[in-house]
């Protein structure tokens, strides 16, 4: 599972690298939303762990104290934030980045977009009471969630911005070393080459 999550993180880095305007738009939207919600009671209660959802409050405090949440918990947290508390996903993504020791701009931003339903249009993630109780051994009781919320809608689309790779050398039968922050294989620069070995670092 750990290796799977590392690979997802690497994939998201490559995905965002090809679509830098997703990040640019997020920063622009966040700046405006942050100002709009600076005195919003629901938002302030959420970041202080003072909502009427027991498990969410516990996770807020856990995040602040330990600077970490389990991956499944992060999904529950984001879903509750977006669909039950009805707060902007941009603020939730910022809250995670402020506290997570392992926070990564690409996987965090795109993960929140995925939960909301705008990363894969029309497909969102909804946390449910039974799922939370099952995987927390019925630890929490007050779990009243919006389990029928529709996905968020975004009219924006992003084209791939690709930088050409120029190398005059013959790369066939050579070894290729790829670093995690440059793993963009949706459109590969090396599709015409046959490598002896490929190393991912």
Model-derived features with residue positions:
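C-terminal catalytic domain of photolyase/cryptochrome flavoproteins
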Residues: 1-72, 79-201
């Amino acid at each position: 599972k750990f290796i799977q999550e590392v690979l997802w993180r690497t994939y998201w880095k490559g995905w965002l690298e090809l679509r830098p305007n997703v990040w640019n738009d997020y920063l622009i939207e966040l700046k405006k939303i942050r100002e709009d919600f600076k005195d919003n009671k629901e938002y302030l209660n959420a970041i202080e762990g003072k909502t009427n959802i027991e498990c969410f409050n516990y996770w807020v405090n856990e995040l602040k104290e330990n600077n970490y949440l389990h991956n499944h918990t992060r999904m529950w947290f984001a879903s509750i934030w977006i669909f039950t508390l009805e707060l902007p996903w941009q603020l939730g993504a910022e809250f995670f980045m402020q506290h997570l020791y392992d926070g990564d701009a690409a996987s965090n931003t795109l993960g929140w977009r995925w939960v909301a339903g705008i990363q894969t249009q029309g497909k969102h993630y909804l946390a449910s009471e039974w799922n939370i109780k099952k995987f927390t051994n019925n630890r929490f009781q007050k779990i009243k969630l919006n389990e029928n919320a529709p996905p968020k809608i975004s009219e924006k689309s992003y084209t791939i911005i690709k930088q050409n790779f120029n190398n005059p050398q013959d790369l066939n039968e050579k070894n290729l070393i790829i670093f995690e922050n440059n793993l963009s294989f949706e459109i590969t620069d090396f599709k015409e080459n046959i490598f002896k070995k490929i190393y991912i670092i």
